[in-house]
């Protein structure tokens, strides 16, 4: 059988659900043609391949390329001054209510050119790519006007043209009330009637998100945005239950959301509803750490009900200025007590599920895109165990 590239003498963590645990294969081979995997499994079970190029992995471990399924990479400015205010005792909510927080980034983002937004985002993206990330989700939400949201989403799309990485984009118009607007209902009307339909028609977004929280939007307002997204044919996801329990997890489940994210205050009913709906719990330990939260997401409830768990950086200027998915692995284990298997699945298979891309990403299986990360490690647990450590040997996207 013909193939373009063949990686042999490798150990595989396939993350395939057809295999137990991490889907480990001690003597493995991966064959790819036209960017997709033809075979990923034991050498003894592989067909005879005639490869244009053969790569000896010398016993290294191969995982699926890593997926960062929740980021805000496109923004202007920074929020270092707010960091100092928090160190002096101000809370995230106090800063937001005083006109800082998201709104301060909105001002900086609107003032930046699209080229400047791309340049800043590329620096952050490059840090993720250097650790084996092959797919990244990028949200808007720092424009909060049709023109500025368009510019942010165009900038996000350009990242995929500038770098060898798959970029999925999410319209987060319902992130905060913009500084020029005082009427929440009127702003939600504008999102639903003007912004979201235009962005959907222009193909700038793959999904729609909202921030359902006391300092942002209510469940009723969020539901209006989700109904408009459904009318536009776009899937939804939700920033939910981060600072309080407004029933965001259950709301996300009611709309069949791809994911609900943060979830520190989610209750058992929310966890059960998410499991029933197939909504992935995306946990964001970087934000938990950075704003010094104390309430841990209910991981035991997610396990009990079979809710899938993913991990992501939540890279953003205010609450998680983090561009290391490897550090997120360690944080997920140490802060949230996730297992090694849950952590590694959370940045591969379950992250793909959270983006609605499990059919072609997230595991090493025939038919999926050949996105690989090759590591200089003795065992996969090292990726979770060590900090400040990047053992990436090679990163392959679409077989190249």
Swiss-Prot record:
Enzyme Commission number(s): 3.5.2.7
GO biological process: L-histidine catabolic process to glutamate and formamide; L-histidine catabolic process to glutamate and formate
Top-level taxon of origin: Bacteria
Subcellular location: Cytoplasm
Classification via Gene3D superfamilies: Metal-dependent hydrolases, Urease, subunit C, domain 1
Reactions the enzyme catalyzes: 4-imidazolone-5-propanoate + H2O = N-formimidoyl-L-glutamate
Binding site for N-formimidoyl-L-glutamate: 142, 316, 318
Keywords, sorted A to Z: Cytoplasm, Histidine metabolism, Hydrolase, Iron, Metal-binding, Zinc
Family matches, as Pfam families: Amidohydro_1
Residues binding Fe(3+): 70, 72, 239, 314
Cofactor, how bound (note): Binds 1 zinc or iron ion per subunit.
Main location: cytoplasm
Gene Ontology CC entries for this record: cytoplasm
Disulfide bond positions: none
UniProt: 4-imidazolone-5-propanoate binding residues: 79, 142, 175, 242, 319
NCBIfam families listed in its UniProt record: hutI
Summary of the function given for this chain in its UniProt record: Catalyzes the hydrolytic cleavage of the carbon-nitrogen bond in imidazolone-5-propanoate to yield N-formimidoyl-L-glutamate. It is the third step in the universal histidine degradation pathway.
UniProt family annotation: Belongs to the metallo-dependent hydrolases superfamily. HutI family.
HAMAP family attached to this UniProt entry: HutI (MF_00372)
PANTHER family xrefs: IMIDAZOLONEPROPIONASE (PTHR42752), IMIDAZOLONEPROPIONASE-RELATED (PTHR42752:SF1)
Protein name per the record: Imidazolonepropionase
Lineage of origin: Bacteria, Pseudomonadati, Pseudomonadota, Alphaproteobacteria, Hyphomicrobiales
